[in-house]
Amino acid sequence: MHAAQARLERRQALRHGSLLPHAPQTVGFFCMDVSFISATLVLPAVVAALAPEGSRWAGDAVILVKPQFEAGREHVGKGGIVRDPAAQQLAVDRVEAAVRGLEGEALALIDSPILGMEGNREFLLHARFA
């Protein structure tokens, strides 16, 4: 019971940025792999936490895009699998839109060499923020 509660608090804290209040200002790269929440909800908090006060963060990121958390419940099939390539692309499009919304640029996308839990196809997105 306590472990699940701790994970929920941690997830909630990360989404709202309070997990990163003392992040070093010299960070030029981050890698993000989140579960049970959309990367689009966490990304703004991470970018804001890494930004020097009064300015924007500049650097590169690799974001693991997990369609089962990005495409919407209506696209998730039995066992939590997103099988439809159009739904997988929708998931990627949503994360790329979140990057652009933070004045970033999606530079490259590859299939993750590791399948997600239950065999989901996942993607690695290289983004740059300037």
List each model region and its residues.
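Conserved S-adenosyl-L-methionine
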Residues: 104-115
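Short alpha-helix
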Residues: 88-102
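Short "lid" loop at the C-terminus of a central beta-strand within the Rossmann-like core
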Residues: 16-17, 67-71, 114
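S-adenosyl-L-methionine
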Residues: 1-42
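A short glycine-rich, Lys/Arg-flanked "PGG" loop and its adjoining helix->strand segment in the class I
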Residues: 40-62
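Core SAM-dependent methyltransferase catalytic element
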Residues: 114-130
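Non-cysteine beta-strand/loop elements that form the S-adenosyl-L-methionine
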Residues: 11, 61-69
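Short, glycine-/aromatic-enriched active-site segment of Class I SAM-dependent methyltransferases
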Residues: 67-84
